[in-house]
Amino acid sequence: MTTFYTVVNWLVILGYWLLIAGVTLRILMKRRAVPSAMAWLLIIYILPLVGIIAYLSFGELHLGKRRAERARAMWPSTAKWLNDLKACKHIFAEDNSPVAESLFKLCERRQGIGGVKGNQLQLLTESDDVMQALIRDIQLARHNIEMVFYIWQPGGMADSVAESLMAAARRGVHCRLMLDSAGSVAFFRSPWAAMMRNAGIEVVEALKVNLMRVFLRRMDLRQHRKMVMIDNYIAYTGSMNMVDPRYFKQDSGVGQWIDLMARMEGPVATSMGIVYSCDWEIETGKRILPPPPDVNIMPFEEASGHTIHTIASGPGFPEDLIHQALLTAAYAAKEHLIMTTPYFVPSDDLLHAICTAAQRGVDVSIILPRKNDSLLVGWASRAFFTELLAAGVKIYQFEGGLLHTKSVLVDGELSLVGTVNLDMRSLWLNFEITLVIDDAGFGSDLAAVQDDYISRSRLLDARRWLKRPLWQRIVERLFYFFSPLL
């Protein structure tokens, strides 16, 4: 019996070390950033069981077998649709401003289509204005409404939007609603999901959280887009979830969430529609390719029209494109670079691009919330401040609530607005969307919004920052080391 237990003990030890060696080899064989690989190895060797379980759950990008097969199957028809769209030459911009030219070329070559012109844009900075505009557009909808949100939180004005959407479905408008399973857990536990389905709305719970499948699909891969398309002509996107900030996370101690949304009319709705179509097919297996733009209603010839490129990210979409777009935008800046984000945990490449811009004379400003709802990200972001301040970057800490807007403005003309945070999760993991806008008028509007944010912020003083307590520096460096995993 003693011999038996000895053999079992040695087999357990051997299996344990073989498992660690196998995971270590897998980490080393994957082409990933060195800091990320080192962080995973440290966790695995300090806390082996916890580290191995964490790596198998979150260390690699698994969409899941069924969704991955759908993603592969949809691309032939999607590629044909994109190729057919190129025949609508009148919707594509032929020229761009000097500051936007490189970025638009990058997007065209990576995604297969160019930027579309003749769009009308409106920036909405108040949640009530967003909800009221959306309700009006839903009430006027005649054919179809598609929505996707990370969070739908019942209560307040969000319920009014839900009522208008159900009314549209009852009068014959084809309504589709896709919500992230983790972000919208309160919605799916409420009566609203059943009420909407009973009204005729197709409601889909995207990337459903299932602990039984934790090793088969990465559970922290989330559907983070916020998009609305109405009648293939009107579109919305930006940082705002379908929540009323007067009711949302009031106990978090960070104040009301401050967001920005763009309302658009024009052919950009078609390019956003194909993104939604891909998401819908990956999640449901059903193909809903949007129709081409209607020449009779698009304001193609209007001189005031905005030129827009839509960048989508996530499994099945061009890899690393949003990260490349941010780098290209930073290196294109000659005079001003203003960034707004709630979560700032940049890659080394993006950090260097921002610092380099400041060091070559560009006026660089980053606007972040002073209080953050994520303790981990809040501390990790502080670890980058010293390097940014030394390079001459201005860091503004917003004090009017949780600044949730995600925006970049380059030289007052090139704008990036959407759902992407400047952190690892948005850059390389989640399903995200960003609008790239080449227009000085829109840039002026965005600059006014950012100036308002700055007026409600406190400029971080470099000398005072360097005198912060030692314990804060230690905590910052600890979270900085694990920043590749956040």
Swiss-Prot record:
GO cellular component, one term: plasma membrane
One Pfam entry name: PLDc_2
Keywords noted in UniProt: Cell inner membrane, Cell membrane, Lipid biosynthesis, Lipid metabolism, Membrane, Phospholipid biosynthesis, Phospholipid metabolism, Repeat, Transferase, Transmembrane, Transmembrane helix
Limits of the PLD phosphodiesterase domain: 219-246, 399-426
Compartments where found: Cell inner membrane
SUPFAM superfamilies in the record: Phospholipase D/nuclease
InterPro entries hit by this protein: Cardiolipin_synthase, CL_synthase_A, CLS_N, PLD-like_dom, PLipase_D/transphosphatidylase
Catalytic residues of the enzyme: H224, K226, D231, H404, K406, D411
Keyword Oxidoreductase set for record: no
Record-listed E.C. numbers: 2.7.8.-
Reactions that this protein is recorded to catalyse: 2 a 1,2-diacyl-sn-glycero-3-phospho-(1'-sn-glycerol) = a cardiolipin + glycerol
Entry membrane topology: Multi-pass membrane protein
Gene Ontology molecular function: any one: cardiolipin synthase activity
Statement: the UniProt record of this protein carries the keyword NADP: no
Coarse class of the protein's main subcellular location: membrane
Membrane-spanning ranges: 3-23, 38-58
Recorded superkingdom: Bacteria
GO BP annotations listed: cardiolipin biosynthetic process
Family of this protein: Belongs to the phospholipase D family. Cardiolipin synthase subfamily. ClsA sub-subfamily.
Entry function: Catalyzes the reversible phosphatidyl group transfer from one phosphatidylglycerol molecule to another to form cardiolipin (CL) (diphosphatidylglycerol) and glycerol.
Record HAMAP family: Cardiolipin_synth_ClsA
Protein name: Cardiolipin synthase A
Organism: Klebsiella pneumoniae (strain 342)
Top-level taxonomy: Bacteria, Pseudomonadati, Pseudomonadota, Gammaproteobacteria, Enterobacterales
